[in-house]
């Protein structure tokens, strides 16, 4: 009897546990952030403030308090002895302000990388592509990520999507992120707040659970029965 030859993509087997929407099945109380949780800061570099590069002649950003919120979370994670991880961007683009060879490639004040931190250097949007970020996180037993940084719709979004796809329990803190206006193909100038809000709406409930800075600091000390974990796409 000739063995059966299978060609092309085979359908995924559907089990009873998969008969419920992932969003429904996996939602629930968010438990306390502990040693399995890392704060991941994306590209907190001086070059993000060169607004005309990112948003054109009318360049402007949203959320001017993002850095102060990030600093408070950073201090809280360090105080609790939890893992801190950074991505730093060294652009392939000659005109980008995010190049290590330029002063604008340096970290913003207060976000200096410490010897005990995880830090990866990247030249694409995702912190997981071309780096050993996932390996370093897994080695430390990290299963949950709290993601903050720049820009909401670029490297933050790409890294958050990949984190969710890689199986991390992923939390995005929109108040600790920011972006700039974007110029569309037709020349339309899309406001930074609109770009930011739409990005968060796309990510929340699919690739991550979006929470506030206050939620994060509270979760460092206790479970949060009032919050729902709504990450799908798992």
Language-model features: locations:
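Short acidic, glycine/proline-rich loop/turn micro-motifs
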Residues: 51-56, 183-185
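Short, glycine/acidic-enriched capping/hinge loops at junctions between secondary-structure elements
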Residues: 50-53, 96-98
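Active-site-adjacent betaalpha module
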Residues: 2-38, 71-75, 79-80, 92, ...
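Acidic-leg catalytic submotif of subtilisin-like serine proteases
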Residues: 38-48
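Generic enzyme active-site microenvironment
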Residues: 41, 87, 173
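A short alpha/beta connector and helix-capping loop motif
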Residues: 37, 53-84
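Short active-site-proximal "capping" loops at secondary-structure junctions
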Residues: 46-47, 84, 90-93
